[in-house]
């Protein structure tokens, strides 16, 4: 449902010798946690059983074919009645012909952008600091 990805020339910002794709994946993972928390919080307002809010999970960050670091935050699983949680989230987010849209994912992502950036910067700075100690 929500995807966090970015593309950059990693050699232009990372000091020589620190060219580590795990750094990028760790940065994505930190951003995912912030996004997950924000979406989970927003989803909890639409609580009947709590299964949708509890189903917000992060996928493992990967480097795709284009060389971009990608991490996803999605709704996994089903509720007690067998309804897919991602399906319920789409109904709430965009509405149906009988129910008005009540966006919660997009505002949660938009509201967490600065937190995501800070978390990613913190991971980067810690890694650079560690590298300078070696």
Feature locations, PLM:
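Short, cysteine-centered beta-strand-loop-beta hairpins and adjacent loop/turn segments enriched
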Residues: 79-89
């Amino acid at each position: 449902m929500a995807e966090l990805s970015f593309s950059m020339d990693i050699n232009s910002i990372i000091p020589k010798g620190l060219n580590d794709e795990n750094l990028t994946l760790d940065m994505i993972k930190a951003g995912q946690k912030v996004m997950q928390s924000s979406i989970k919080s927003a989803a909890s307002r639409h609580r009947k059983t709590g299964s949708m809010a509890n189903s917000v999970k992060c996928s493992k960050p990967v480097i795709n074919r284009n060389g971009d670091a990608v991490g996803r935050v999605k709704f996994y699983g089903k509720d007690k009645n067998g309804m897919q949680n991602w399906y319920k989230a789409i109904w709430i987010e965009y509405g149906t012909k009988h129910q008005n849209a009540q966006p919660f994912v997009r505002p949660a992502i938009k509201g967490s952008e600065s937190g995501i950036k800070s978390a990613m910067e913190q991971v980067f700075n810690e890694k650079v600091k560690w590298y300078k100690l070696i």
